[in-house]
Structure formats: C-alpha cells, structure tokens
Amino acid sequence: MLLDKTSFYAEAGGQEYDTGNIFIDGVADFEVTNVQVYNGYVLHTGRLKYGALEVGNEVFSTYDEVRRSHLRNNHTATHILNFNLREVLGDHIDQKGSLVSPNKLRFDFSHKRQLSLDEVATIERMSDDWIRRDVKVYGKELDLQTAYKIPGLRAVFGESYPDPVRVVTLEHDVDAIVKDIENPKWRRTSVELCGGT
C-alpha cells in the first residue's frame, strides 16, 4: 500500500522497519508487516484483516509503539557503542554497517586487530554507564557543511548523505553544539550523522 505521507519507518541503514496498522475506523484494517522503499516510494506490505480499501481513501495509520521503542533503544545503543569503540580503540574506528532489530543489534566496524577481553569489558562497562545515566538524545537537521565542522562528528564512510542531514547527539543539544561549533569538547560525546529513529 502506498500513502501520500507516512509515520512508518521504512527499513534503511541497517535498522528494521516499523509494523502496525492502516485503517478506516470500523470499515477496514490493513495490518502492516513490512515497510520498504522502492524507487523513492514507501511501500507498506501486509494483509487486509477486514473491509476494503480503495485509491483515494482517507486512512489513519499507527505504528507499533512497543516495536518502535525497542528499535529506538537499540539504535541509540549503536551510537553509544560507536562512541565507546572510538574512545577505547582510537579514532581510526569506522562503522562499516549495522543491524538494528527489536531484540538485538550488530555493529560492524574496522580495526587493525582482534579486541582483547579487557577492551571488550571496558567498552561494555562504558556502554552500560551511558545507559544507566539515561542520557538525553537530541536530533536536528543541519546543512551538511555545518555538520561537517563539528569536532568528532561520525559518519559511515562511503555513505551518501542528504543536505540537509539529520545530526544525532547524546547529552548535548545540537543547537548548543552549533553555537560553539569548533569547541573540541564535542569530541568527548557522541555526534553522528543519522537517518534512523
């Protein structure tokens, strides 16, 4: 099903899609089981539970908030992990890919050697600390040229980003960072170009 606008997140950048429902109250209910982008169109796939839908119908859509919440949490965890990998292993760490699903995440990165058990334990301890502190997540669209001026900004090497681009930070508001954009202290927090939830 195609909509003129949608609140559903289509699978992209390693993050899985939203699920939910598109409906006309009491008339029809379409269960969305997958959301993908094809040729610039967001396609909601699933099954019609009851009723009928036609081109031009005004519908309501609602994504599964529990699934989205788990996706959002694991997505934020990839930002935390990316930052802590760089802190422990060095600035040469580059994200190569990721998988964000409701019940797990995978983070692919480049490094010169195998991690030691002590490094893994340190990264895990630091990540747990960020989570325990329940740091605030900020997101804002910036023009690409401004975003690239932020010290410590992380991006996926080889990825093509739109202009403007969404910048996601932990602990510090994006507006505060932009007001003091060349401050080297931004290297001590997670600042990334991001297209996820």
State each model region's role.
Residues 1-197:
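A glycine- and charged-residue-rich anion-binding loop/surface
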